[in-house]
Amino acid sequence: MKIRAISLGLALTMAALVRFEAGFETGSVWGLLTPAEAHASSESAWAQRPSGDQLRRLAHLEPYIRYFTSLAYGPEDARVSADYIRALILTESSAHAHARSGKGARGLTQIIPGTARIVMKKLAALSYDFLYIDEDVFKSFKPEDLYDPALNILIACYLSATYHGWYDGSTELVVSAWNAGPGAVARYDNEVPPYPETRGMITRLKGFMAYLGEGNVN
């Protein structure tokens, strides 16, 4: 099967960015970049070694990670870094597909159902035949569907694509938007918000990326 690019445009104002807190309000995906900055910052971070159990769980997800990160997003046919998605999964859930936070975020990358519903509408509009995804889920999405590893990873790639486009591939700002929301990033003039949880997540994710970047996961 030849994988074609998903080309989507993005028209977004700063006001819309601030209103984005609860999910997609306007626009759609830009190209998902694998920025040199991400790799440079990863190399300078202390590598954080996952546990053996984490690595075993992550290994079972490889077909989904490799497939969804092989899809090209946007007019530049850019692709998401597989190591970024692996690191996001390790950071958010320790690769537990049925993880759930006290705030209701679910699945491997801890996605809020409200945000997922908006993304699902965007994905449904593409009429794209994704592998590993039952097309009926686009018509009748339920919060528990976020426990499906393939769907969770697809949504994570789509969301991350938008953030990478907005923040020119800055790992720190992409993670800040993921954790605290784009509105928080905007309130602090496109700087990392001074939230301990957000800054801790950035450190952990970059640590996992540094470990993965050493070629420790095939």
Regions found by a protein language model. Name each.
Residues 16-29:
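Membrane-interface motif at the C-terminal end of an N-terminal transmembrane signal
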Residues 31-96, 120:
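Export/targeting segments at the very N-terminus of extracytoplasmic proteins
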Residues 92-123:
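Conserved alpha-helical segments that form or flank metal/cofactor-binding pockets of metalloenzymes
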Residues 113, 117-187, 200-201, 206-210:
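Alpha-helical segment that forms one wall of the substrate-binding/catalytic cleft
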Residues 77-96, 110-111, 154-157, 174-179, ...:
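Short, functionally critical alpha-helical segments immediately adjacent to catalytic or ligand/cofactor-binding
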Residues 47-56, 72-75, 97-105, 139-150, ...:
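Second-shell loop/turn segments in exported
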Residues 4-19:
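Hydrophobic membrane-insertion alpha-helices, especially the h-region
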Residues 60, 79-84, 170-173, 196-200:
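Alpha-helix N-cap and coil->helix boundary residues
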